[in-house]
Amino acid sequence: MTTIVSVRRNGHIVIGGDGQATLGNTIMKNNVKKVRTLYNDTVIAGFAGGTADAFTLFELFEKKLQIHQGRFVKSAVELAKDWRTDRMLRRLEALLAVADKNTSLIITGNADVIQPESDVIAIGSGGPYAQSAARALLENTDLCARDIVRKSLQISGDICLYSNHFFSFEELIHENKDII
């Protein structure tokens, strides 16, 4: 699996992920880029699960964004519905963490579209470790979103066998948000 973390703070939205790809219990590659920008760089997304499956889902989500003219939540719900009902898509094994300037979501193959209660999302095998670290850092430090994501990924990479310390990041800035 992997670790993907998303944090919102002071108008900055960052999604970061580790780079490890495994096949069974063997590390196949250390520098996979699991985060991407979509829809003219207005959406950021990260995946946990099968790489080919995730790229398929990225493409489908971007098509939904185009069809629905960038309406983020509507596009996520429509993707989840298709994922659940289409016989071929149902076989895809991945989770997506996606964000635009206003909203962060987790999209699953069970037709779940989940908006977190807090400003943190973490998915993948290292997700629980990263989420715990990110929440603690968000609540108890003044670190920026990117530094929180980086430190959370480092902690997860130290604990989770299926995560490493090669990180990639994507960031959005909410221009209308007052940065304190």
From Swiss-Prot:
InterPro entries assigned to the protein according to its UniProt record, in alphabetical order: ATP-dep_Prtase_HsIV_su, Ntn_hydrolases_N, Proteasome_sua/b, Proteasome_suB-type
Organism whose genome encodes this protein: Wigglesworthia glossinidia brevipalpis
Subunit note: A double ring-shaped homohexamer of HslV is capped on each side by a ring-shaped HslU homohexamer. The assembly of the HslU/HslV complex is dependent on binding of ATP.
Binding-site list for Na(+): 157, 160, 163
A molecular function (GO) term: threonine-type endopeptidase activity
GO cellular component, one term: proteasome core complex
Xref: PROSITE patterns: PROTEASOME_BETA_2
Enzyme class: hydrolase
Primary subcellular site in the record, as a coarse category: cytoplasm
Activity regulation information from UniProt: Allosterically activated by HslU binding.
Function in brief: Protease subunit of a proteasome-like degradation complex believed to be a general protein degrading machinery.
Family according to the record: Belongs to the peptidase T1B family. HslV subfamily.
Subcellular locations according to the entry: Cytoplasm
GO terms (BP aspect): proteolysis involved in protein catabolic process
Superkingdom, natural source: Bacteria
Gene label: hslV
Protein name as it appears in the record: ATP-dependent protease subunit HslV
UniProt keyword list: Allosteric enzyme, Cytoplasm, Hydrolase, Metal-binding, Protease, Sodium, Threonine protease
